[in-house]
């Protein structure tokens, strides 16, 4: 998902995860009608969607493990053994299993984003929304995070990612949508003969 600053990329993402009301038109996501979405339904919507933010949104007063445990408890998990196993599984998947005891401020930006991606995977979401997931990262770390997201996508997960980084779009060729003038368009790659 591309577009200039202020084109509506983040607003679209926020609408998809229930943070903003759908203003006009129709829309549904993972079985929820965005026009009729009620406040009490939002937690259930978010259990089906993994969200990755540009600024990570990790709790600095908790370890990596406790950040993920917090999410599991908040989404209704009860069994401690299952929660521990799930946390280990997602941390292993993003290459952060050995850093479970660290606080977010002890991690690099790329490591924090890996933890944020692990958090998004906790409830086996149908869709992952990634809003500028490489926006605060250097080019090398951005490629590493994109490689990870690409690997997750290849495992069968759908990902909608907003970005300003056109180099990443060129390197990781996927369907591209553009926000412009309050509308959404599919960008069709042009081929030369």
Model-predicted segments: where are they?
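Conserved ABC ATPase signature
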Residues: 103-107, 111-113
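Short coil-to-helix segment of the ABC ATPase nucleotide-binding domain corresponding to the Q-loop/switch region
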Residues: 62-70
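ABC ATPase NBD coupling module
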Residues: 34-50, 152-154
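Helix-to-loop junction immediately C-terminal to a conserved catalytic motif
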Residues: 17
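Catalytic Walker B motif of ABC-type/P-loop ATPase nucleotide-binding domains
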Residues: 128-131
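Conserved ABC transporter NBD signature motif
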Residues: 25-33
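Conserved signature/switch motifs of ABC ATPase nucleotide-binding domains
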Residues: 102-105, 123, 155
């Amino acid at each position: 998902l591309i577009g200039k600053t202020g084109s509506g990329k983040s607003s679209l993402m926020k609408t998809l995860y229930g943070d903003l009301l759908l203003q006009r038109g129709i829309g549904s996501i993972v079985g929820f009608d965005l026009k009729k979405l009620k406040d009490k339904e939002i937690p259930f919507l978010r259990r089906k969607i993994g969200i990755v933010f540009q600024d990570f949104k990790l709790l600095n007063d908790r370890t990596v493990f406790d950040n993920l445990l917090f999410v599991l408890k908040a989404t209704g998990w009860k069994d401690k053994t299952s929660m521990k196993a799930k946390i280990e599984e997602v941390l292993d998947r993003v290459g952060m299993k050995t850093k479970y005891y660290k606080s977010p401020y002890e991690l690099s930006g790329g490591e924090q984003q890996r933890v944020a991606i692990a958090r998004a995977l906790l409830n086996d979401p149908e869709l992952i929304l990634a809003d500028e997931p490489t926006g605060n990262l250097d080019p090398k770390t951005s490629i590493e995070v994109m490689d990870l997201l690409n690997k997750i996508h290849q495992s069968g997960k759908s990902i909608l990612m907003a970005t300003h980084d056109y180099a990443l779009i060129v390197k990781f060729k996927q369907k591209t949508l553009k926000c412009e003038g309050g509308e959404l368009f599919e960008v069709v790659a042009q081929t030369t003969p």
